[in-house]
Amino acid sequence: VAIVQLGNTGAARSITHLTLIAGFASTVFWPLTTALHAELSWREVYFVFATLNLCLCLPIHLWLRRRPRPAASTGAVSEPAAPASDERPVGEARRSMAFLWMMGGFAAAGFVLSAVLLHMVPLLTALGLGTAGVLVSTLFGPSQVASRLINMMFGGRLPQTILAVIATTLLAAGLTLLLTGAPNVAAIAIFVVLFGLGSGLISIVGGTLPLEVFGRVGYGARVGWMSAARQFTSAFAPFLLAVMMAGLSVGLSLAVLLAMALVGVLAFAVIVWLQRLSTPAVPTKDPSPA
C-alpha cells in the first residue's frame, strides 16, 4: 500500500521485488531464531526482534511517511489522471462485479493454501508417502521463491489478471496430480513444486491485481478487503480439512480442495473477461479515398 501511495509509476514491479525479498524472511530468520533460542529464553528472543522493529523498521516507516505523496493519495481534489502503465482498470459499470469476483478468488485461494500448507506432512503421510513426505515438502519454499524470481525477470508485460489465473491454475494442477498420482514420489514432488509456484504468484497478485483492475484511488481499502477475505477463509480451512480427513476419505477431502481451487480459477477468469469488455476497441481507418 505504501508503494502505491508514494506514487511510483512502476508500483507493480516494486511490489514484485518486495515480495521476492520477503520470501527469504523465513530462510533467514528461522535459523536465526533457532540460534538465538539456544542462547536466550523465548522472551529475550522476542525482545531482540522487538528492538529490531523499533530501531530499524520504525525509522524507515517514519521516513516514508514524510515523503510527499500525489494528490490522489492525500485526498486533494484534482483532475482525473490517466491510468498508469501498470493499470488496466475495468469500466465503472463493472467494478462492483469485478470486486466481488476478486474477493471470491482470493478467498478460494487462501482456503486452499492454508488448508494444504498446515497439513502438508500429515496429508502426504496419509497418502502413503511416509517419512519421505518431510523431505519432499521442503521443495515448497524454493519453488515459491523461484516463481517470484521468474515473474520478476520475465513477467513484466504479463497482465496481472492473467497471472492470477496462472497462479490458481497451478494450485489446481498440483492438487489434481496429488489426487491421481499418490503415493508416487515423483508425482507428489511435482505437486509440491506446482503448489509452491502457485503460492508465490498468489502473494504477488494480492498486491498488484487490485492496482491493475481498480487503479490507485482507494487502493488501500480494496487491498484490505481482499486480505480480509483471504484471511477469513484461511482461518477455518485447516480445521475444516482436518474434519474432512477424519470423517471422509483423504481422496474426497482433496476433491473438495480441488473444487475450491477451480473456483479461484473461474473467479479470476471472469475478471479477465470483464477487463476485456472494458477495453475500448481500436478504431480502424476507412480504406476508401477521401
Task: Enumerate the predicted regions with their spans.
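C-terminal transmembrane helical hairpin of 12-TM major facilitator-type secondary transporters
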Residues: 106, 137-143, 157-209
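A membrane-interface helix-boundary motif in multi-pass transporters
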Residues: 35-51, 243-261
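Cytoplasmic helix-loop-helix junction between adjacent transmembrane helices
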Residues: 1-20, 215
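Flexible cytoplasmic inter-helical loops of multi-pass small-molecule transporters
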Residues: 65-88, 280-284
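Helix-to-loop junctions at the C-terminal end of transmembrane segments
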Residues: 147-160, 245-246
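A late C-terminal transmembrane helix in Major Facilitator Superfamily
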Residues: 26, 213-248
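Helix-loop-helix hairpin linking two adjacent transmembrane segments in secondary transporters
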Residues: 18-69
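Extracytoplasmic gate region of multi-pass secondary transporters
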Residues: 94-146, 151-153
